[in-house]
């Protein structure tokens, strides 16, 4: 039995052995029992590049909960999917294959995307298995598969029929790099350098007025000038016309309370469209439309009263080129009053990083703005872990003023099940015919000459937000959604929206939010910064259990800096667990069940009382998804109570030296029981080392990760008086250790006489003498001036130290 402990823990061999065993025995298979289930809505990783340590960080957090729930006896539904369509995957393909989607046929590009997605899915699966994620791989899904496309297209048609989805020509966010519309959730603000340019305008009556702008290239698209109605400087201008310099266009001067008096000159030009405020004014005041930026991000469609030569020069220029030319012309004509360098927040596309433009375009939208109040109610029905994360989504919903644009002008995605007749009628297929691809299929009763094909594809979130519908399970809402905080406004929000529209319900009872894994410089890991850590290197050096230990040392929802020091602590912890198990294995019979009826000694009952409290705390923490707190209390008990104290004080009785059989059996059964329960509590975090020890000492046929293996918080384990006596014992031991340390003596150094000011039960004297290495214990009440204070003196060869 002890042969495995003759060597150091060889994690590589152990991991290979158990990955094979768990896979072949289908240990984590969902039984679809219909009762006592725990359903997890797993985040499907996006096929957008190599997984880094940050992905391992968050995916392990979910696995802790899945393993715990399985050990509770639950039938755990824990699928894995891959979000292998959409813009992120296309960008990966273009980068890795050094091609552009526009340079080859649509069919050829989609074929290449399919091949690349398959290759990356294999890599992802290997990583997840190597880190010990306990997915049921029989539940694997791909968002580009025919089955998922059918679900997504069915959702689209149902929402359309309910009036929750529409197609309309309206302003949208446009990414000029990827040449596609994007949703508000895909827009982020980046701090960029720019110039605030103060430009000389005039009124039609000839009065000089100045307007400051960072986007002078939009002057040909100016449709109005605004001031705040409370700004007395400009109240006399209301209703007059302003003349746009260079181009000569006349635009109305209007007032609106959204103008910031203290920004720029207090006058602002409204262009179609420079930002969201322009859209707001355009709608509110029913302004004209002048779109001068093409979908490629160049200047186009210029139509001005004057400056035709300038228009010709601007035509076809990029936005930055046009801006520079306009500034040059303004300076040349003494129309540039001031040019001030600034840094400001600019809305950029999340994927490409390019500043977004707002263009008019026909797109598909899911209604959001009209039901914000209802969505906030849904959010409040869900238990958020940590609770503070709920505020993020509430702020997001409250600030929404755009519906969700779900159409993308891309290629590798779920097709819209839509055709258009020549007169613009929307044609939908029979749901029973789904999935369809309108670029290949025809609607029933139509010829190809009678229709126009919808070539756009759906936003990948429009599909992945239906993840709770991907498998036909009766348990709804799901018990848990686990995800990171940066996709609260996308994946979490969209899933809540879809569940409300389709089921009038919440998608899950609980949502557990992980933070980011930050680089050692405390910044977000990024390939461009060169601070990304690859999991395989860490797994090769430390092993899966140690890496998982590191991921568990993060507060729920908090960003955590990567730390080699915590990995080293994890390695030390694994080694100590192995060695402690080796020690216990010396005294117990292999596969024998520890018998609590043999546990009679006070210090054995003390460690059981401490164990009981740890089981209660760990169980409560896991039930509230606080895996970090669970690990902390288990680890503290292991190091301080079990290893530092109990193993030392029970050694003599475990070896059976000069004691009764009863004392020996009490120690041996306690060691066996406490170690077994410790292994069980550590199993969700460190599945490999705990499995190896458990199968070696306790059960060769049953896995520690099987159902109903979580320790029971049996109140019979706890005895308050034994706990208090034990704490006094430990206090004496700590004082003795302190005395020896201050005298620079070994902890094993013999004590001639241990003097205590309080009477101590005789039943504990043997353990106390053994652990302190004391010849005798003397009770001296004369030094007991303070009745409450415990005083300990130690005598070494007639030298007494207090």
Curated annotation (Swiss-Prot):
A motif ('KMSKS' region) lies at residues 524-528. ATP binds at residue 527. The keyword Protein biosynthesis applies. GO terms for biological process: valyl-tRNA aminoacylation. GO terms for molecular function: aminoacyl-tRNA deacylase activity; ATP binding; valine-tRNA ligase activity. InterPro entries: aa-tRNA-synth_I_CS, aa-tRNA-synth_Ia, Anticodon_Ia_Val, M/V/L/I-tRNA-synth_anticd-bd, Rossmann-like_a/b/a_fold, tRNAsynth_Ia_anticodon-bd, Val/Leu/Ile-tRNA-synth_edit, Valine-tRNA_ligase_type_2. Pfam families: Anticodon_1 (PF08264), tRNA-synt_1 (PF00133). The keyword ATP-binding applies. It is found in: Cytoplasm. GO terms for cellular component: cytosol. It catalyses: tRNA(Val) + L-valine + ATP = L-valyl-tRNA(Val) + AMP + diphosphate. PROSITE patterns: AA_TRNA_LIGASE_I (PS00178). Its EC number is 6.1.1.9. Belongs to the class-I aminoacyl-tRNA synthetase family. ValS type 2 subfamily. Monomer. ValRS has two distinct active sites: one for aminoacylation and one for editing. The misactivated threonine is translocated from the active site to the editing site. This is Valine--tRNA ligase. It comes from Ehrlichia canis (strain Jake). The lineage of its organism: Bacteria, Pseudomonadati, Pseudomonadota, Alphaproteobacteria, Rickettsiales. The gene is valS.
């Amino acid at each position: 039995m002890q042969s495995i402990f003759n060597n150091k823990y060889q994690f590589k061999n152990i991991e290979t052995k158990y990955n094979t065993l768990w896979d072949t025995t289908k240990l984590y298979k969902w039984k679809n029992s219909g009762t006592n289930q725990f359903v997890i809505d797993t985040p499907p990783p996006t096929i957008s590049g190599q997984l880094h340590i940050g992905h391992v960080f968050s995916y392990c957090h979910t696995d802790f909960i899945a393993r715990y729930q399985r050990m509770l006896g639950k039938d755990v539904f824990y699928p894995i999917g891959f979000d292998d369509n959409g813009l992120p995957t296309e960008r990966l393909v273009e980068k890795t294959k050094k091609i552009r989607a526009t340079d080859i046929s649509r069919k050829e590009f989609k074929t290449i995307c399919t091949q690349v997605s398959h290759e990356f899915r294999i890599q992802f699966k290997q990583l997840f298995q190597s880190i010990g994620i306990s997915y049921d791989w029989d539940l694997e899904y791909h968002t580009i598969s025919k089955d998922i496309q059918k679900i997504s297209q069915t959702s689209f048609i149902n929402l359309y029929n309910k009036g929750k989805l529409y197609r309309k020509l309206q302003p949208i966010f446009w990414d000029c790099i990827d040449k596609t519309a994007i949703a508000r959730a895909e827009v982020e603000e980046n701090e960029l350098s720019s110039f605030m340019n103060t430009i000389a305008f005039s009124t039609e009556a000839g009065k000089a007025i100045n307007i400051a702008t960072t986007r002078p290239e939009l002057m040909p698209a100016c449709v109005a000038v605004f001031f705040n109605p409370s700004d007395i400087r400009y109240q006399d201008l209301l209703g007059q016309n302003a003349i746009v310099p260079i181009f000569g266009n006349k635009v109305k001067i209007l007032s609106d309370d959204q103008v910031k008096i203290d920004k720029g000159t207090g006058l602002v030009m409204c262009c179609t469209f420079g930002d969201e405020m322009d859209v707001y004014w355009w709608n509110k005041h029913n302004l004209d439309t002048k779109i001068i930026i093409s979908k490629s991000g160049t200047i186009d469609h210029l139509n001005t009263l004057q400056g035709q030569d300038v228009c010709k020069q601007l035509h076809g220029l990029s936005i930055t080129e046009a801006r520079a030319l306009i500034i040059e012309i303004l300076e040349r004509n003494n129309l540039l009053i001031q040019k001030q360098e600034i840094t400001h927040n600019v809305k950029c596309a999340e994927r490409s990083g390019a500043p977004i433009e707002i263009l008019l375009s026909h797109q598909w939208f899911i209604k959001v703005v009209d039901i914000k109040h209802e969505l906030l109610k849904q959010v409040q029905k869900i238990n958020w872990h940590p609770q503070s994360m709920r505020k993020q989504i509430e702020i997001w919903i409250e600030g929404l003023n755009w519906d969700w644009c779900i159409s993308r002008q891309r290629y590798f995605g779920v097709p819209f099940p839509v055709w258009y007749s020549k007169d613009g009628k929307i044609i939908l297929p029979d749901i029973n015919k789904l999935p369809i691809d309108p670029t290949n299929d025809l609607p029933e009763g139509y010829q190809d000459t009678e229709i126009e094909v919808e070539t756009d594809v759906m936003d990948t979130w429009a599909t992945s937000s239906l993840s709770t519908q991907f498998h036909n399970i009766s348990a709804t809402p799901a018990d848990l959604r686990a995800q990171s905080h940066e996709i609260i406004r996308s994946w979490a929000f969209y899933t809540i929206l879809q569940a409300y529209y389709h089921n009038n319900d919440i998608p899950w009872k609980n949502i557990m939010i992980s933070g980011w894994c930050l680089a050692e410089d405390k910044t977000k890991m990024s390939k461009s910064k060169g601070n990304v850590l690859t999991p395989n290197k860490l797994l090769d050096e430390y092993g899966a259990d140690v890496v998982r230990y590191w991921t568990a040392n993060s507060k729920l929802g908090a960003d955590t800096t990567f730390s080699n020091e915590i990995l080293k602590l994890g390695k030390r912890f694994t080694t100590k667990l192995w060695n402690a198990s080796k020690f216990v294995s010396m005294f117990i019979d292999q596969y024998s069940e520890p018998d609590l009826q043999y546990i009679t000694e006070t210090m054995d009952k003390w460690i059981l009382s401490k164990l009981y409290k740890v089981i209660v705390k760990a169980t409560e923490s896991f039930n509230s998804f606080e895996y970090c707190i669970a690990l902390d209390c288990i680890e503290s008990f292991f190091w301080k109570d079990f290893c530092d104290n109990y193993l030392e004080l029970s050694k003599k009785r475990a070896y059976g030296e000069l004691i009764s059989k009863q004392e020996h059996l009490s120690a041996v059964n306690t060691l066996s029981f406490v170690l077994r329960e410790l292994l069980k509590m550590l199993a969700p975090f460190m599945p490999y080392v705990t499995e190896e020890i458990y199968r070696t000492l306790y059960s060769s046929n049953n896995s520690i990760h099987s159902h109903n293996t979580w320790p029971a918080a049996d109140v019979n384990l706890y005895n308050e008086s034994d706990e208090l006596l034990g704490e006094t014992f430990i206090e004496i031991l700590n004082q003795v250790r302190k005395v020896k340390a201050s005298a620079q003596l070994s902890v094993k150094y013999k004590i001639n006489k241990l003097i205590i000011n309080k009477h101590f039960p005789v039943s504990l004297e043997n353990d106390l003498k053994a652990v302190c290495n004391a010849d005798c214990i003397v009770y001296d009440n004369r030094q007991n001036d303070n009745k409450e204070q415990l005083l300990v003196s130690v005598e070494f060869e007639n030298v007494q130290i207090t």
